[in-house]
Amino acid sequence: MLSTGGDLTYLNASTSFETGRWYHVVGTYNGSRMRIYNNGTERGSNTSRRGSIDYSPATFVIGCYLDDNEFYPLEGFISEVRLYNRALSSQQVRNRYNRTRGRHTTRPKPPVVVTNRELSAGPYLAFTSPSEALVRWETAKPMPTRLAYGMTPTLQNRINQQERKRSHEVILPGIEPGAIYHYSVGIEKDGQTQWLEPATGESDFNYSRPDISAIESPYAQDERMRKSSAAAEAILAATGIRKGYALDYGCGEGRLAFALASRTELTVIGVTDDAGEATRARAALRRAGIYGTRVTIQHRPLAKLGHTDNLYNLAVSSELLHNGELPGDRVELLRVLRPSGGVLALDGLPQSGLAKLITGSPLVLGTTTEVSGELLLAKRKPLDGAGEWTHTYGTAAQTANSGDEIVNGSKMALQWFGKPGARGMIDRQGRNPPPLTSNGFLYVQGDNRIWGQDAFNGTILWNYEFPSELRRVNTPRDGSNMCADDSSLFVAMRDRAYRFDGKTGRLLRSFPVISNEAANWGYIANDDGLLFGGSVKPGSEYTKFKGTPYWYDSTGTQDTAKVCSDNLFAIDRQTGRKQW
């Protein structure tokens, strides 16, 4: 592609690009004609440009498409690059190809002989630690399976699973940052291993935090540290909260904050109004090597934190634990606690004393309480009047209305900013499915990947890398492949719909499309305990999005043709039984 001013002109070869093969590719421009050559033969030309090339001041990049917010790398290797200050003739290109042909051997890769329809779920990839990834898939009946994988499409590594089972998972070790991992599932069929369509996962989207459980404590193992460690264990066991943001309200010298951070992926903010305590806490946590990354200590008045509303997944108090007093202001504690499940975990007094801390305060109306051992847990209720956006156009009825009764245009403020960002997304012109939100969860679909996030603070709770079959674009003429309820996300991919737990991402169930012939799952919605679907002909979905031909903003048939279902059905979303 090039420009002589204004828009870019793209030149495509008339031959298809296949991974696992070497190509000699040449592009030339002589001031009036663009040409592209493949293996010594001209495969395309364009005369729409005249004059000198308009060189951009941006970085010159080979091997990918890169701009301010997009990155599409080549799937393969580049052996050699040559740049000329003149346009080569067709004969010169052919001569150059003849001198280099045969220099490279094509690397073998597993043959693709069956499609992913042979699976009852997956495959999909999740990063479980900074150095490991997990690939999951399910088969309709128990069978041994294999996984071929590697950092190139040649899939040079093999993992065999001899056990006959339906649910399969394989750990990929040695994950490196900034790498693309290719993998393919092999299933036993007719006495042979048959390989499925390869998929990829990018470690740029590995958000796993390092395990810091083995770091040496910067605190003496005195009674206060032992009490803090025991309290952290009890709080985590009772709440199950291991990701997000935690507040230590009256944090003392940071012992409880350290104990929580070292056992979880939480980011812990400790606040104290004592300058000496803040200084000692920071010094200790710096010695441990986690200050500023996992724990931060703030010296400020407890009655006026200055933190945004509805932020924290967990709130505790070292001051209460060790001295029997809950400092600060109950109104402020409730204000910063995350709605729909944020937990204030109280410890340090008998249950009767802990209950008095709640009685007569705003915490009574804003939370529900329960006893767990020596703890009193106050869980914040959902926001009264809060809306949700569970389908592409708001609701299953496509009302384009969230039902929110809280928003006031004169009082809006930034809640959070951060990941996932633009890197893993499809460009806006492709019009892929929009984010959904319900009950404090936010679901974002990118290019063959989905993130599950905390809607109140942006924490990435889980994310999956999917095969290219997930992609759905031009939704005004096709439709989204996602919908949500108050606890889960439904995703249509290929011939199935998947239900993932909103908090953990765990696969709860997969639902096969209902059709009398081969079909993909098209329309998807849920309401009143039912999951609705429509079957479409395989391959009828819009999936292409790279380049101006796929901005879907023209009035031609390519952009405006509607994808229609062949049928409509309803399934009980709990049991999976067809209702009609």
What is the predicted role of each segment?
Residues 455-457, 501-505, 572-575:
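Short loop/turn segments that connect beta-strands within beta-propeller blades
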Residues 59, 427-450, 473-498, 515-568:
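Repeat-blade elements of multi-bladed beta-propeller folds
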Residues 325-342:
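A short glycine-rich, Lys/Arg-flanked "PGG" loop and its adjoining helix->strand segment in the class I
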